[in-house]
Each structure stands twice: as structure tokens, then as C-alpha cells.
């Protein structure tokens, strides 16, 4: 629940390394020369691996409309009253939800934590076309992981929307203790996967997060909507044919 950021930038939209333009998706192998014993493992995996941000990329984020309404105040007032760091600490798993409730507001006022969680749950929904796009990618045996800044409440999203039917909740900030765009978080991701950065494509609605992915060598796509993402993936050799995106 950080303050709203600029989500569009001509400088960062649809950034990707030139190699993805030149080389189609490979069913196996590693894109980087000189790999060691990891090659045998890589050859058994379908590449590239797809890393998806979740909020406002796959799932609607309730914070910008539903949460101000829940507290009965406009967004500007909410941002002025809210502690500037407590949600970030919650996303990094440094505090639990009880401490979030105690420190959410600068003045320490009480609020209905369970009501807020229900507000969030009610507001979670798939963005138009994204469930179908994920279903198509999963059916084509792509390896898909969530790579998200979100607290333990990702369990609420999973309970409602069942994203695990299409991806693994592998890289969550609340577990890693790090948030995008910290480069160390990205390096942990590729280290855990046992691949080179260039074997991954990262999709996120925030240009700063995409920029960091590209700087460490990943392919990067700045998400706008499901229709444009399907086109961008097709440009990279990943053909996504989803009706009525």
C-alpha cells in the first residue's frame, strides 16, 4: 500500500533484451554460453521461465479505490494519515498483522482489521483476460512463478482466485524479506531457479521494477493489459491465442 506510482513511461514500456527479438523461445537449453553442470538441468526445462508480478498485473489491487472507501476518506487524506513505512514492513514480513493494525495510522487510532481484510478480499479479482492468458501459458507447459511485493495476505488472494492453478507462489516479499526493485531480490530469484537471468521473462506494471530486471539481464515487459501482453509475448516467440482479450 505504498503511495501510487507512475505506471506508464515511454522510456520503459515493453523493455526487453535484443536477444529475445533474435531468438525464439527454446524448449530447452540455456541462453548463456559457458554454463556448467546446470546445463543438464536446464535442458530438461522449458525456457524462458515466466515471472509475474501479481497486483495490478494479474489481480486488481483494492488499495486505490476500495480501501479509502473502507476508511471513509479520500486517498490523499489516507496517505497523509497512514504510517509511511508500516505496509512496507508488512510486505517484507518484518511485522505481523497485529502490529500492522497497531501502527497503520500515525496517530495510532484503532480500526477494524478483519473488516479491512474482508474489504481487500472482496476487491480482489482477475484483471480482464489475465486468467485466460495464464491458463493458456500453463497449458503450454511454461514454468510460471509469482514474483511479488505482498504480505502474507497473498493467502487471501489464493483462497479466492486460486492462482496456484496456473503458477507457483514462489517469490513473495513477505517470505524473502526483500522488495522489488532491490537487485538482490532478483538475484535470489535466478539463484533459486538455477538458471541464468536471460532465461527469465519478468512482467510487471511498474516500470522501475521492469528496469531492474533488465539491468540484471532478464527479459522485461511492462504490463498494460492482457491484450498488449499477449502481443508482446508473441513478439518474443511465445504465441498466446486467447479469445476476446
From Swiss-Prot:
Any single Gene Ontology cellular-component annotation: chloroplast
Keyword Signal (UniProt) = no
Q: Which UniProt keywords apply?
A: Chloroplast, Hydrolase, Plastid, Riboflavin biosynthesis, Transit peptide
What are the TM regions of this chain, as residue ranges? Answer: none
User: Which BP terms from GO are recorded?
Assistant: riboflavin biosynthetic process
Q: Which cofactor does it need?
A: Mg(2+)
Q: Which GO terms describe its molecular function?
A: 5-amino-6-(5-phosphoribitylamino)uracil phosphatase activity; FMN hydrolase activity
Q: How does it assemble?
A: Homodimer.
Q: What does this protein do?
A: FMN hydrolase that catalyzes the dephosphorylation of flavin mononucleotide (FMN) to riboflavin. Can also dephosphorylate 5-amino-6-(5-phospho-D-ribitylamino)uracil, also known as ARPP. Not required for riboflavin biosynthesis in planta, but may help maintaining flavin homeostasis within chloroplasts.
User: What protein name applies here?
Assistant: Flavin mononucleotide hydrolase 1, chloroplatic
Q: What is the lineage of its organism?
A: Eukaryota, Viridiplantae, Streptophyta, Embryophyta, Tracheophyta
Point out the gene that encodes the protein.
FHY1
